Amino acid sequence: MKNFYGKVLPRLGVVLCVAAVVVFLVSSSSKAGSPVGEMTAGKVQLQSASALAFGPDGILFVADSMGGKVVALDTNDHTAMKMAAKINVPGVDTKVAALLGTTPDQIMINDLRVNPISKNAYLAVSRGKGPDAVPVIVKVDGMSGKLSEVSLDNVKSSSVSLVDAPASDTAARRNPRLQTVTDMEFTSGKLFVSGLSNEEWASALRSIPYPFNQADKGTNIQIWHASHGRFETAAPVNTFVPYTISGQSYILAAYTCTPLVKIPVSDLKPGTQIKPSTIADLGSGNTPIDMVPYKKDGHQYILIANTSLGVLKLKADNLETYRAIESPEVPNPQNKNISGVPYDTISDLTGVTQLSQVDDSNVAVLSKGADGMNLTTIALP
């Protein structure tokens, strides 16, 4: 036995030491290569919070249009939801206002996003009105509906400046700086950002690798707007979704008055100008708010919330077959689109101001009713 311990224990000690070193190195490598490993802790300064998006590991992207940057926050919200989230917060505007010590008429909910891991919802809120409004991020528990403010005093974060952000012009009909970022989506290791730039073709779409290093100039866009009967470069994309068409990656972008444009991701090169195809024109006097792509009963759909047209359910099975609209044709209002993607109107959904996908079957809906704003979860129609 003495010989056994004398020979085996030293060898066992060596094995354990080697194993410990391997575990340490793997752990260190994993941490260094993770998005959180690229962040530093401290106070985050925001001038505004205009749009939200989620990336890997529960990272929350916050667009600061007035600050001309995008901030990535470690929400530390990484625990997967084991049950289906059913967010239901009636009078959410009143509850947000109470949380922030003010009244509902003194807040604005700018965006809604659901964390795809935890299923908790996050709201980009302005406390106050005008240039003195204070940006706040509010978390809504996916199960209890409890609201809490996300502290920015000591949080891990990183940021990237948008080098081609437009200058502030308070005398303009609408300050272009406020539309530096209109929407964001994360996919395939990149954050796609729509909005305005300081270029002659002001409408821009930016593709920013994450973890952040730097942001190049965006790609500037000219579209054919059938409702207006002209080419346009000044209006930003209001909302968009990454989408695969015939095996190729596209951005499906919706603009005010309501052209739907497909933009090849391969065309997005810094500082260039592109002229993508308009494949639908859903009608003037309307602003699209949010888009949610999904699959149901073997078919592909895109849900679009709008200010005037209500919530539309676009049939997206064969987007590659729709010809480009290159003349002033407008689909008629009876769902018989003479040039564009067919759709149905979801009459049960009214007053919708924000949408965010919860999972493959459900969507979070922020809507305005007679008694204020309500946040609910419904099955995708």
Residue positions per predicted region:
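Bacterial N-terminal signal peptides
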Residues: G13-F24
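Cleavable N-terminal signal peptides
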Residues: V18-A19, S29-K31
